[in-house]
UniProtKB/Swiss-Prot annotation:
It holds the Pfam family Plug_translocon. Component of the Sec protein translocase complex. Heterotrimer consisting of alpha (SecY), beta (SecG) and gamma (SecE) subunits. The heterotrimers can form oligomers, although 1 heterotrimer is thought to be able to translocate proteins. Interacts with the ribosome. May interact with SecDF, and other proteins may be involved. Belongs to the SecY/SEC61-alpha family. This is Protein translocase subunit SecY. The central subunit of the protein translocation channel SecYEG. Consists of two halves formed by TMs 1-5 and 6-10. These two domains form a lateral gate at the front which open onto the bilayer between TMs 2 and 7, and are clamped together by SecE at the back. The channel is closed by both a pore ring composed of hydrophobic SecY resides and a short helix (helix 2A) on the extracellular side of the membrane which forms a plug. The plug probably moves laterally to allow the channel to open. The ring and the pore may move independently. It is a multi-pass membrane protein. Residues 47-55, 130-140, 192-209, 278-312, 398 are extracellular. The chain crosses the membrane at residues 29-46, 56-88, 111-129, 141-161, 169-191, 210-227, 256-277, 313-331, 383-397, 399-412. It comes from Methanocaldococcus jannaschii (strain ATCC 43067 / DSM 2661 / JAL-1 / JCM 10045 / NBRC 100440) (Methanococcus jannaschii).
């Protein structure tokens, strides 16, 4: 991978801020990027007036995209590149110690290069899968260039948010897209709330209209409750006698990352399956009306709503098992490749002069203690978010069960970061501690 360094150095990047970014500036940059994202979602791609198959509606929820516009691919290329790199490193095909800062920077650079390549690969797949109807070779080329270029812009908008804003661009785009879907679905002119009230006035209340809203609220409460659960490890300062503290480890240790990666993987399987089917190679399944009807693609497609679950319970069970296993796998890979493993966390705690209360001061002792919590929490939290996302899909929550889960989790994390940013600005001493 080191042979790619000359190429990586030539890829444009958003420079790191030369000075500390204030809270107001972070809000400003986050707002600017959000506005640009919505503007791009309103700019139609030339010749993109064809009917969109139902499969691409699922792609929109997971990848924060809007088919037929500049953000047709959404964050798909970014997430797909992340999946590929995670699998390559996690499986040992690429030998790389990501605890070394230089290796981690190289890993991120290669992931960015792969993201740009995937912009063009997925653009070709979309056109080949018939997302824009039947096009002449010239028009197909123009559409590919437009949607690939739009996705490359999103890559750099994600960088801007990561370096100058609050949270990450990926999370921001998903939350924005799903929130819009929930608002329109519940309170729009044809929203479920008005339909339910109308049926109530007519004396024949229809529970089907209010069920998606109730499902969304249930998912919201469950995610917030899970985000508040944590394990606290008592710490003692090695130099200041009597100084104690606590190191909190959240139950949802890996956040929503496993669900994002798993859902994106399943969406890519649908996309590849449809493209191959149109080429006469139905190895992933056959399709009717843009939806898989058999094969791997069918069993990894989302059964949305209770009616779908009841009509084919085997499909629902296989999908749930696959989602949970995939989330656990990506959760483990994510912890190992992002420095959240016990060894890396022990180094961070040790560098602050802290030690586990009641144990001798050494990174090995801290690591041994953390191994009792981090690996089990990684597996349990990954399985939990996978299970919850699946149940939310089965209930038929607005914005898609997976989308609601991701949005609530993302917004909650952004809320926590906003509080930290505000406290840091008011109390500089606390800022130093939080940064460490």
């Amino acid at each position: 991978m080191k042979k790619l360094i000359p190429i990586l150095e030539k890829i444009p990047e958003v420079e790191l801020p030369v000075k500390e970014i204030t809270f107001k500036e972070k809000l400003k940059w986050t707002g600017i990027v959000l506005v640009l994202y919505f503007i791009m979602g309103c700019i139609d791609v030339y010749t993109a007036g064809a009917q969109i198959p139902a499969i691409f509606e699922f792609w929109q929820t997971i990848t924060a995209s809007r088919i037929g516009t500049l953000i047709t691919l959404g964050i798909g290329p970014i997430v797909t590149a992340g999946i590929i790199m995670q699998l390559l490193v996690g499986s040992g095909i690429i030998q790389m110690d990501l605890s070394i800062p230089e290796n981690r920077a190289l890993f991120q650079g290669c992931q960015k290069l792969l993201s740009i390549i995937m912009c063009f690969v997925e653009a070709v797949l979309f056109v080949g899968a018939g997302a824009f109807g039947i096009l002449t070779p010239l028009l197909a080329f123009l559409v590919i260039i437009q949607i690939a270029f739009g996705s490359i812009i999103l890559i750099y908008l994600d960088e801007i948010v990561s370096k100058y804003g609050i949270g990450s661009g990926i999370g921001l785009f998903i939350a924005a897209g799903v929130s819009q879907t929930i608002f329109v679905g519940a309170l729009g002119p044809e929203g479920y709330l008005w339909k339910f009230l109308n049926s109530l006035i007519q004396g024949v209340p229809n529970i089907e209209y209010i069920a998606p809203i109730i499902g969304t609220i249930i998912v919201f409460l469950m995610v917030v409750y899970a985000e508040c659960m944590r394990v606290e490890i008592p710490l003692a300062h090695g130099r200041i006698k009597g100084a104690v503290g606590k190191y909190p480890i959240k139950f949802v240790y890996v956040s929503n990352i496993p669900v994002i990666l798993a859902a994106a993987l399943f969406a890519n399987i649908q996309l590849w399956g449809l493209a191959l089917y149109r080429m006469g190679i139905p190895i992933l399944g056959h399709y009717e009306g843009g939806r898989a009807v058999d094969g791997i693609a069918y069993y990894l497609s989302t059964p949305y709503g209770l009616s779908s679950v009841i009509s084919d319970p085997i499909h629902a069970i296989v999908y749930m098992i696959a989602m949970i296993i995939t989330c656990v796998m990506f959760g483990i890979f994510w912890v190992e490749t992002t420095g959240l493993d016990p060894k890396s966390m022990a180094k961070r705690i040790g560098s602050l002069g802290m030690a586990i209360k009641g144990f001798r001061k050494s990174e090995k002792a801290i690591e041994h203690r953390l191994k009792r919590y981090i690996p089990p929490l990684t597996v349990m939290s990954s399985a939990f978010v996978g299970f919850l996302a699946t149940i939310a899909n089965f209930i038929g929550a607005l914005g898609g069960g997976t989308g609601v889960l991701l949005t609530v989790s993302i917004v909650y994390r952004m809320y926590e970061q906003l509080l930290r940013e505000k406290v840091s600005e008011l109390h500089p001493a606390i800022a130093k501690l939080l940064n460490k």
